[in-house]
């Protein structure tokens, strides 16, 4: 059970790291699937 929890925690950390790497990669609005690119970060477009 403890091994499973450690594995899940590691998987979550890897997913967050990959997500952050993708978020920081935007250079213009077309790089963000749904939102705007602001200073290299994809921000959600509200409204």
Swiss-Prot record:
The keyword ATP-binding does not apply. Expressed in salivary glands. Highly expressed in the head, body and tail with a 2-3-fold higher expression in the head. It is found in: Secreted. The modification Phenylalanine amide is found at residue 46. GO terms for cellular component: extracellular region. Disulfide bonds join 26-37, 32-42. Belongs to the annelide toxin family. This is Peptide HSTX-II. The lineage of its organism: Eukaryota, Metazoa, Spiralia, Lophotrochozoa, Annelida.
